[in-house]
UniProtKB/Swiss-Prot annotation:
KW DNA-binding (keyword) present: no
Protein topology in the membrane: Single-pass type I membrane protein
Task of the protein: Potential calcium-dependent cell-adhesion protein. May be involved in the establishment and maintenance of specific neuronal connections in the brain.
Protein name: Protocadherin gamma-A1
Alphabetical list of SMART domains matching this protein: CA
Transmembrane segment boundaries: 693-713
Side Extracellular, residues: 29-692
Residue intervals annotated with topology Cytoplasmic: 714-931
Comp. bias regions, Basic residues: 921-931
Domain Cadherin per the UniProt entry, residue ranges: 29-133, 134-242, 243-347, 348-452, 453-562, 570-682
């Protein structure tokens, strides 16, 4: 008991020293905790947050976690309390077997700071295991001649606990022949031996029953028992003897299964059954019994399972030899396992970033890596590296930890991802290595602007394109990815001819296709300059511009326009004069036309499409000049009708036609004399008016019917007055009727000859109007022109006039329009005019029938139009000065029935001349004096 107490005190002193040493080490840098084994899951181990200088909230926010190597996690972190707790029940015996102290080492990784803190937790043993023997019963024989003092080794008990909780003492049940002696072995465990105290007598007691008790030093004390049966046999005086006092062998760990490792040998000089020796393991660990096999007859030891240097570096076992009479001998066998390089390094990626932006600076941490090799010596010394052509490097930390960092700035546009191979190799022979791959994606940032495929674009578009048609497309590309490469197109706002660009063009924001919002006209504009912007969807967005030139191509969409002779609204033209004495090639007139197109679409050619007298006239192909093709003959008709076609050279060609009326005569007076023989009749117009009113009355309501009746009565009254005036013609001063001629196409005719005709000198209230039928195709024949007649008026009416009929007012020399008086509707005329402009087709037809030309002015050649005799001043129209402004003012020559006013020229008033309505009328001078 004294010895046991002494041992207990020593153990406590050793534990105290060991604890002080651990505390000193923890104070030097490591964090040290202790926890009893078999505590419940979640038991408190230590305040790790306090020891690390962290707040409990930082355990969750900072990514603090436990990094352990190759085993199930034994501990966990409580983020709320900041404490280290057990993750499961811990069995110290399973974890450390008989090792003391039992330390569990791991690292605390603070990912936010990328720091490692080593932590050691000592597992404190508790008395949770009872000492046990491998056998429940032990039976052996002892010769009765065995001398007192003979020692018999007994099986020793095993207690998985350590320290005071391990096996501390043995006790043998009381027996007069046997006693117990416990020997302290050199390798640590106690070896119980049974000592024969007095000689045996088989005849007195053949079998002895003993109980061996093994007890530990825990609180409470635990114990195990072994029943021993000793059979006393007859005398066998020679026990087996081994050839060696101890067997020792070195075996490489990679020996094949079933390899004979060594052979023990024991001899017995006895004969017969007393000399037959059998072998068996005695007092071996259960793991040893699982790995090795002992042949009971030959003593051969072989391995049943692979040897592992990393598990056991040396195996110690005891082999027992027993003869047939029960005598035994024991020998110790030591098998040392030699390490071979059979374990490749283990690479563990503790923390890794799978994606990194391309603009991160060098030194960015990508991964945290640990390397471990279970071999020893050079076989367990490892190095770690990556390929040298990568923009990364490995930096070694503590305890075989490495971190992978960027060595230079990454560029996703060059390489969008990396497959990094990390190789760990040991120094064994042959060297073993392990490769681990990390896939790293380089994420994009918006560092590239869109780039167009061309520096500038040009496109040619035919005019008259349909609205909404696709006319061009631009494309740009962006080296970035995802939304940073999603390009939208837009037009930079500009103006074209005062209108916004968006009114003409639009662009598809996704495809870059340009669409026309309207049909373009080459004659309006011929090109457009615009800029297209390509913008990506990055943050912030980047953009680039490109210039685009759109050129319109002319299409033949405009027919030639005939400038001269100008076409009045009713389609008729003026009358051109060709003298009878004209030689072949005589210039009669000239057709002037233009085309708003360009190029060959505007090249014009002229041809004579139709003529009333084929072969009489010709038209210049490119000049449009109408000339006589032969000399004029008496048999040629006085009126020649020509249809001239003007055609451009477009595809398809467009054309326009004009009808010319050529009068064959030497003088204008001849034509007027021939045409004046026709008697004007006012009744057709009255009948037309009546018919018009009847048709209109059928289409309108009853209200309009009353109005038509009143209007008809008014017209009949006027007609009655005119008949009364004609009946009083006895006192009317006569004038040849041939001096007043109705001419077909009067409005065009009077573009050249501007005259106005009046019957009396002072006809302010009533003028005699001679409506003339519209002869559209032929001039009045010569026979009709030879008829003589006089127009008469009542003498009383003539006496009221102050000017003679023979005196004619000079024509209005300002017969051209000013810029503000170009042909247009009545609403565009000068406000100074007192006349009324016809505003419907009916009034226009009446106006044409009532306009007369002055014969006397044409006969004496005093016209202010200019030109030589017989030409009627036509040459002035063919010169370069002829423009569209050379249009007569018809209002100087017009009398409106039912009105007491005539249309006048405001310019005449400014010149101090009398209005055309007064100066243009023929008045008799004699009557003027009488008045």
């Amino acid at each position: 008991m004294k010895i046991q107490k002494k041992l207990t005190g020593c153990s406590r002193l050793m534990l105290l020293c060991l604890s002080l040493e651990l505390l000193l080490e923890a104070g030097a840098g490591n964090i040290h905790y202790s926890v009893p084994e078999e505590t419940d899951k979640g038991s408190f181990v230590g305040n790790i947050a306090k020891d690390l200088g962290l707040q409990p909230q930082e355990l969750a926010d900072g990514g603090v976690r436990i990094v352990s190597r190759g085993r199930m996690p034994l501990f966990a972190l409580n983020p709320r309390s900041g404490s280290l707790i057990t993750a499961r029940r811990i069995d110290r015996e399973e974890l450390c077997a008989q090792s003391m102290p039992c330390l569990v080492s791991f690292n605390i990784l603070v990912e936010d700071k990328m720091k490692l803190f080593p932590v050691e937790v000592e597992i404190i043993d508790i008395n949770d295991n009872t000492p046990q023997f491998q056998l429940e019963e032990l039976e052996f024989k002892m010769n009765e001649i065995t001398t007192p003092g003979t020692r018999v080794s007994l099986p020793f008990g095993q207690d998985l606990d350590v320290g005071m909780n391990s096996l501390q003492s043995y006790q043998l049940s009381s027996n007069p022949h046997f006693s117990l002696d416990v020997q302290q072995g050199a390798d640590g465990p106690q070896h119980p031996e049974m000592v024969l105290q007095s000689p045996l007598d088989r005849e007195e007691e053949a079998v002895h029953h003993l109980i061996l008790t093994a007890s530990d030093g825990g609180e409470p004390v635990r114990s195990g028992t072994l029943r021993i049966y000793i059979q006393v046999v007859d005398a066998n005086d020679n026990p087996p003897a081994f050839t060696q006092a101890q067997y020792h062998i070195n075996v490489p760990e990679n020996v094949p299964l079933g390899t004979q490792l060594l052979m023990v040998n024991a001899t017995d000089p006895d004969e017969g059954a007393n000399g037959e020796v059998t072998y068996s393991f005695h007092n071996v660990d259960h793991r040893v019994a699982q790995i090795f096999r002992l042949d009971s007859y030959t003593g051969e030891i072989s391995n049943k399972e692979p040897l592992d240097f990393e598990e056991y570096k040396m195996y110690s076992m005891e082999v027992q030899a027993q003869d047939g009479a029960g005598l035994m001998a024991k020998v110790k066998v030591l098998i040392k396992v030699l390490d071979v390089n059979d374990n490749a390094p283990e690479v563990t990626i503790t923390s890794v970033t799978t994606a990194v932006p391309e603009n991160f600076p060098p030194g960015t941490i990508i991964a945290l890596i640990s390397v471990h090799d279970q071999d020893s010596g050079d076989n367990g010394y490892t190095t770690c590296f990556i390929p040298g052509n990568l923009p990364f490097k490995l930096e070694k930390l503590v305890d075989n930890y490495y971190r992978l960092v960027t060595e230079r700035t990454l560029d996703r546009e060059l390489i969008s991802g990396y497959n990094i191979t990390i190789t760990a190799i040991d120094q064994g022979t042959p060297a073993l290595s392990t490769e681990t791959h990390i896939s790293l994606l380089v994420t994009d940032i918006n560092d590239n602007s869109p780039v167009f495929h061309q520096d500038s674009y040009s496109a040619y578009i035919p005019e008259n394109n349909p609205r909404g048609a696709s006319i061009f497309s631009v494309r740009a590309h962006d080296l970035d990815s995802n939304e940073n490469a999603q390009i939208t197109y837009s037009l930079i706002e500009d103006t074209i001819q005062g209108a916004p660009l968006s009114a003409y063009l639009s662009i598809n924001s996704d495809t870059g296709v340009l669409y026309a919002l309207r049909s373009f006209d080459y004659e309006q504009f011929r090109d457009m300059q615009l800029k297209v912007m390509a913008r990506d969807s990055g943050d912030p967005p980047l953009s680039s511009n490109v210039s685009l030139s759109l050129f319109l191509l002319d299409q033949n969409d405009n027919a030639p326009e005939i400038l001269y002779p100008a076409l009045p609204t009713d389609g008729s033209t003026g009358v051109e004069l060709a003298p009878l004495s004209a030689e072949p090639g005589y210039l009669v007139t000239k057709v002037v036309a233009v085309d708003r197109d360009s190029g060959q679409n505007a090249w014009l050619s002229y041809r004579l499409l139709k003529a009333s007298e084929p072969g009489l006239f010709s038209v210049g192909l490119h000049t449009g000049e109408v000339r006589t093709a032969r000399a004029l003959l008496d048999r040629d008709a006085l009126k020649q009708s020509l249809v001239v076609a003007v055609q451009d050279h477009g595809q398809p060609p467009l054309s326009a036609t004009v009808t010319l009326t050529v009068a064959v005569a030497d003088r204008i007076s001849d034509i007027l004399a021939d045409l004046g023989s026709l008697e004007p009749s006012a009744k057709p117009n009255d009948s037309d008016l009546t018919l018009y009113l009847v048709v209109a009355a059928a289409a309108v309501s009853c209200v309009f019917l009353a109005f038509v009746i009143v209007l008809l009565a008014h017209r009949l009254r006027r007609w009655h007055k005119s008949r009364l005036l004609q009946a009083s013609g006895g006192g009317l001063a006569s004038m040849p009727g041939s001096h007043f001629v109705g001419v077909d196409g009067v409005r065009a005719f009077l573009q050249t000859y501007s005259h106005e005709v009046s019957l009396t000198a002072d006809s302010r209230k009533s003028h005699l109007i001679f409506p003339q039928p519209n002869y559209a195709d032929t001039l009045i024949s010569q026979e009709s022109c030879e008829k003589k007649g006089f127009l008469s008026a009542p003498q009383s009416l003539l006496e009221d006039k102050k000017e003679p009929f023979s005196q004619q007012a000079p024509p209005n020399t300002d017969w051209r329009f000013s810029q503000a008086q170009r042909p247009g509707t009545s609403g565009s005329q000068n406000g100074d005019d007192t006349g009324t402009w016809p505003n419907n087709q009916f009034d226009t037809e009446m106006l044409q029938a009532m306009i007369l030309a002055s014969a006397s002015e044409a006969a004496d050649g005093s016209s202010t139009l200019g030109g030589g005799a017989g030409t009627m001043g036509l040459s002035a129209r063919y010169g370069p000065q002829f423009t569209l402004q050379h249009v007569p003012d018809y209002r100087q020559n017009v009398y409106i029935p039912g009105s007491n006013a005539t249309l006048t020229n405001a310019a005449g008033k400014r010149d101090g001349k009398a209005p055309a309505g007064g100066n243009g009328n023929k008045k008799k001078s004699g009557k003027k004096e009488k008045k």
